[in-house]
Amino acid sequence: MAREIKDIKEFVELARRSDIKSAIVKVNAKVNANGKKFKQTKFKVRGSRYQYTLVVNDASKAKKLQQSLPPTLKITNL
């Protein structure tokens, strides 16, 4: 089962739980309505029951969030 998280603070709290062992960071190239390219970053963490996903469209926020993930997580970049 999957759950989408909208709040960054809630996602960071989830990532610090004891049952969360791994994270996946996926960067997609997207085009907005004006035809301008941007990078969409998806953060996925696997819990015991759900896979939680956070979608970030701002590259600077995504970089800060990736640095704030706990060092105990096994992070895979796609």
UniProtKB/Swiss-Prot annotation:
GO biological process: protein-RNA complex assembly; translation
Gene Ontology cellular component annotations, sorted alphabetically: cytosolic large ribosomal subunit; hyphal cell wall; yeast-form cell wall
Chief location bin: cytoplasm
Manganese among keywords: no
Any GO MF annotation of the entry: structural constituent of ribosome
Family annotation (Gene3D superfamilies): 3.30.720.90
InterPro entries: Ribosomal_eL38 (IPR002675), Ribosomal_eL38_sf (IPR038464)
Record bears the keyword Ribosomal protein: yes
Record's subcellular location: Cytoplasm
Superkingdom of the source species: Eukaryota
Keywords: Cytoplasm, Ribonucleoprotein, Ribosomal protein
Subunit structure: Component of the large ribosomal subunit. Mature ribosomes consist of a small (40S) and a large (60S) subunit. The 40S subunit contains about 32 different proteins and 1 molecule of RNA (18S). The 60S subunit contains 45 different proteins and 3 molecules of RNA (25S, 5.8S and 5S).
Function: Component of the ribosome, a large ribonucleoprotein complex responsible for the synthesis of proteins in the cell. The small ribosomal subunit (SSU) binds messenger RNAs (mRNAs) and translates the encoded message by selecting cognate aminoacyl-transfer RNA (tRNA) molecules. The large subunit (LSU) contains the ribosomal catalytic site termed the peptidyl transferase center (PTC), which catalyzes the formation of peptide bonds, thereby polymerizing the amino acids delivered by tRNAs into a polypeptide chain.
Family of the protein in this entry: Belongs to the eukaryotic ribosomal protein eL38 family.
Descriptive protein name: Large ribosomal subunit protein eL38
